[in-house]
Amino acid sequence: MRNAEVSRNTLETKIAVAINLDGTGVSKLNSGVGFFDHMLDQIARHGMMDISVECQGDLHIDAHHTVEDVGIALGQAFSRALGDKKGIRRYAHAYVPLDEALSRVVLDISGRPGLEFNVEFTRARIGEFDVDLVREFFQGFVNHAALTLHVDNLRGKNAHHQAETIFKAFGRALRAAVELDPRMVGIMPSTKGSL
């Protein structure tokens, strides 16, 4: 099974995460930030990955450190669970609509961290959640999972719908990219021979 656990403890957060890339979409989430847990659940359900997150963060300041550090820890766990990357499809994309909103996520499990994030949220907050933190989560994940990620919200009027389509599309693209290709068993999906 492709799974991993990561603990990350700093002066700002104490985090324990676990991920199973070949799961059934089950999640156990306690970041202390309700909307963020709702978004992480989208990754698990649409990515068919089992994800567990337990976090105690400095929420008396704001949610920035919590969201960013969960992204870092999940990225580390994802990378460990993926292992040597042999046999995976590597590239994937997904479009996801939710009513008026439509987002596209394209990714490459390349070994090269890179984030292109083109989202203009229609408001600054979703409830108490600062929409700037969506990008912070993905930057943390990308840096530590070592993947190239393009996120584009193509349209949307409701900020909740914009965010939800992004996280759903991310989960679906991850699921497709980590899928084992029966024609690539034991083969590195790169002409370089490594990722």
Curated annotation (Swiss-Prot):
Gene Ontology terms for molecular function: imidazoleglycerol-phosphate dehydratase activity
Catalysed reactions, as listed in the record: D-erythro-1-(imidazol-4-yl)glycerol 3-phosphate = 3-(imidazol-4-yl)-2-oxopropyl phosphate + H2O
Pfam families: IGPD
GO CC terms, sorted: cytoplasm
Main location: cytoplasm
Alphabetical UniProt keywords: Amino-acid biosynthesis, Cytoplasm, Histidine biosynthesis, Lyase
Group of enzyme by EC: lyase
Pathway annotation from the record: Amino-acid biosynthesis; L-histidine biosynthesis; L-histidine from 5-phospho-alpha-D-ribose 1-diphosphate: step 6/9
GO terms for biological process, alphabetical: L-histidine biosynthetic process
CDD domains associated with the record: IGPD
Compartments, record wording: Cytoplasm
Enzyme Commission numbers on file: 4.2.1.19
Alphabetical list of InterPro entries matching this protein: IGPD_sf, ImidazoleglycerolP_deHydtase, ImidazoleglycerP_deHydtase_CS, Ribosomal_Su5_D2-typ_SF
HAMAP family hit by this protein: HisB
Classification via NCBIfam families: PRK00951.1-1 (NF002106), PRK00951.1-5 (NF002109), PRK00951.2-1 (NF002111), PRK00951.2-4 (NF002114), PRK00951.2-6 (NF002116)
PANTHER family tied to this protein: IMIDAZOLEGLYCEROL-PHOSPHATE DEHYDRATASE, IMIDAZOLEGLYCEROL-PHOSPHATE DEHYDRATASE HIS7
Family membership: Belongs to the imidazoleglycerol-phosphate dehydratase family.
Full protein name: Imidazoleglycerol-phosphate dehydratase
Source species of the chain: Aminomonas aminovorus
